[in-house]
Amino acid sequence: MKIPASRRARLPLVLVIALLAWASMAPAAHAAPVQVLGTGVALEPPPGFVPAQRFTGFERDVKSASIVVTELEGPAPKMQKGMTREMLASRGMTLIRSQTVRVHGKSALLLQVSQVAAGTEFLKWMLVAGDTKKTVMIVGTFPKAANDLALPIKQAILSATWGGKVQAAPYEGLLFRADPTPVLKLAGRVGNALIFSESGSMTHGDPNQAILVMGNSSSAFSIANVEQFARDRATRSTQVGELRNIVGRALTVDGLPGYEIVAEANDARTGREVRMYQLVLVEQKTYYLAQGFVPADRARVILDQFRQVTGTFKRLRAPK
């Protein structure tokens, strides 16, 4: 899961970096359209793909392949313009090609990207579509060696439809829920993450306001030492610089072992002093991560609000 860099429109950019893939023009897929839980998107999954347990989309574990669907507030044309060769290269990805196509009767950008992860070369296909208010991103990933999946995944991505009357419930398909407070409202959802903000919006409002994001890991992941993992995870945030005066404590929420961290830092983009809040909860091979950011001069009040939200965390179903 990626955590937003600021209180404004940086959330979509962070998710773009995390969810890059490609697609190209192809015939329709073979399965019947399936609504992706937690989204307003439907597509025809390839044979052998099933609804994912930890993210919004479909997966085929035996092939290490997935299709991830994400909806973002913000204009699609702006998002498409940012998908440059240089931006991809800065994230360790190689742009193979890109093209403009029409999907669901609308113009969309298709990118083909390759990336090496854990010694394996993957191909990522990404569709970036939508309108002036919302962006739809559909990412297909598969090992380069599994070439038999190339066409089926491409077909599935290009079969996507969206923008109908179907409105997903905030917690639909999630492994958990967490409740808002009068101060921190539920602004929305991005994939398997809930976004809380003071304004109740993900892309608008006062940049001085606080934001909290909570989600779960998108794949199975064993954690032997919760504190060690939490401290390491906090230092990997790209939203702030070096952490200072780190204060941590072990705690239990909904019966799960966890570790909470509060630290001083400076915003990576503006240099402004902020407070970072983080909570990690572990359930077997799934972990839940909450990260919040607030200007330092408002930390005393808002840190309590972060804790009120995370204190309502409750599992809705067991991950498989």
Predicted regions and their residues:
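Short, solvent-exposed coil/turn segments at beta-strand boundaries
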Residues: P47-V50, V62-S64, K106, A129-V136, ...
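Bacterial N-terminal signal peptides that target proteins for export
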Residues: K2-L15
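Surface-exposed amphipathic alpha-helical segments
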Residues: V41, P45-F49, M87, I138-G188, ...
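Short, well-ordered beta-strand elements
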Residues: I67-T70, K134-P143, I211-M214, T286-P295
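Bacterial N-terminal signal peptides
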Residues: P12-S24
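Signature of long, low-cysteine stretches enriched in small and polar/charged residues
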Residues: P33, E86-D131, A230-V282
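Secretory pathway targeting signatures of secreted, lumenal, and periplasmic proteins
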Residues: Q35-G82, S114, T120, R177-T235, ...
